[in-house]
């Protein structure tokens, strides 16, 4: 599976879009990728939180069934289970949508196929929510850029978090 992901990266770098799609198709149907997707779901901290169907993958038999279900072509996503959790500031609650285990596994499977392309085409100076990148990497890059003789003399900091609370 890792080899397939490397081939997807190479095809993306060469601009071979049809080959990328073909390799992604192969990857999403491979048994090892389906097993890994289910494994990621059952090893996730939210593994004991069922969706609207009430199912959790707590036995080897259920995990094997989930792997087989991922090969089905007649997939239709289930509605999300809506739960309200308290906000950090203590004022009000925010909605949280919880997908079923099957939906989570399918999302994990497609992430395996899409991530090589996303990481290949992403901005090299983007550090948020990226695999193999951390806050420490972003800080290190800031120090490297600011250590130059042509670096800016001022750094401005702004807090725009509250701007997103009222988005439509």
Q: What is the predicted function of each stretch?
A:
Residues 1-46, 112-128:
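Charged boundary/loop elements
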Residues 7-8, 66, 142:
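Generic hydrophobic alpha-helical segments
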Residues 10-13, 28, 95-100, 128, ...:
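Short, charged/polar micro-motifs that form catalytic or ligand-binding hotspots
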Residues 15, 70-71, 143, 147:
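Inter-domain linker/hinge segments that demarcate the starts of reverse transcriptase
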Residues 20-88, 93-94, 99:
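Phosphate/adenylate-binding "loop-and-lid" substructures adjacent to NTP/NAD/dNTP-binding pockets
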Residues 87-90, 94-120:
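Hydrophobic alpha-helical hairpins/lids featuring a short glycine-rich hinge
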Residues 107, 114-166:
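Active-site-proximal segment of RNA-dependent polymerases
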């Amino acid at each position: 599976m890792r080899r397939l992901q490397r081939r997807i990266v190479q095809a993306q770098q060469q601009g071979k879009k049809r080959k990328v799609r073909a390799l992604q198709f192969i990857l999403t149907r491979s048994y090892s990728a389906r097993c890994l997707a289910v494994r990621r779901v059952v090893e996730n901290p939210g593994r004991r939180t069922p969706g609207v169907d009430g199912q959790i993958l707590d036995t080897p038999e259920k995990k094997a069934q989930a792997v087989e279900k991922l090969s089905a072509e007649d997939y239709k996503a289930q509605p999300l289970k809506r739960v309200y959790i308290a906000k950090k500031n203590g004022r009000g609650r925010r909605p949280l949508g919880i997908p079923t285990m099957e939906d989570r596994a399918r999302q994990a499977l497609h992430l395996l196929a899409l991530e090589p392309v996303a990481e290949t085409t992403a901005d090299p100076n983007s550090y948020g929510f990226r695999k193999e990148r951390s806050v420490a990497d972003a800080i290190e890059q800031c120090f490297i850029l600011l250590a130059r003789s042509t670096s800016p003399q001022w750094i401005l900091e702004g807090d725009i978090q509250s701007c997103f609370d009222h988005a439509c």
